[in-house]
Amino acid sequence: MTVRKRFGQHFLVDESAIDRIHAVLAIQPHDRVLEVGPGLGALTTGLLESADKVVAIEIDRELVGVLKDRYEALEVIEGDVLELEIDQFSGMRVVGNLPYNIISPLLTRLFAHACLIRDMNFMMQREVALRLTSDPGSKAWGRLSVTAQYHCDITYLFDVTSEAFRPQPAVQSAFVRLEPRQRTVNPVDMEGFNSVVRQAFGQRRKRVGNALKGLKVPWQKVGIDPSLRAEQIDVDGFVRIANSCVGNAATTTGEGLE
């Protein structure tokens, strides 16, 4: 099997790590599962044994052939998950050992459809997992943290060493669960919320009052000290800022997560 670096392939081979993942997933007979990047099927076998249905998305044509030959019950979609319509997977649990180079753009796409997804369970670079689960005031708290924690309750489940993969990655990994939630407070405009967060963290060393100077935020009304820096403001603080700027043209430029 040829490992293709452009796809960021690191195949999970450690049986204890595989068993631990299946234990925390606790797939039920009624579950429908979307597996992103199944590779050689390290997780696929167990998923098929437990779930009602498993759909696998694989970009590597050679691996698509391997999966189709190996698993008669598996529905395999050949393609890039970043280009597929997420709506078609409504109600499914999402599982994946993710190539590190697609984590951020994939999460961006999934967050936009979070209300349709039951949960997301991903192997990812440990550094990213720490950012996802960080707290306001820490150095790891940033744009990804705010956006992810707005959309989901996130649980850092366990670490996985580089020795669990072939070829071994240069970094450590972690397995994380993201559970979409219904918030009692929501930005009126998600594009504006994303733009506010992007602008605030785009100038981390600046006080938030200066970083968002062009938005004319009514700081006293939103209850936030403008002398704070972005990493000191929690998710609901950014929600209040975004809500106070509804209709402001400066908040209408949205981009993917960094």
Set out the residue ranges of the language-model regions:
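Conserved Class I S-adenosyl-L-methionine
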Residues: 169-170, 206, 210-258
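Short amphipathic alpha-helical interaction segments
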Residues: 189, 193-196, 200, 204, ...
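Catalytic cores of RNA-modifying enzymes
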Residues: 1-199, 240-244, 252-258
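Hydrophobic alpha-helical segments, especially transmembrane helices
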Residues: 5, 205-206
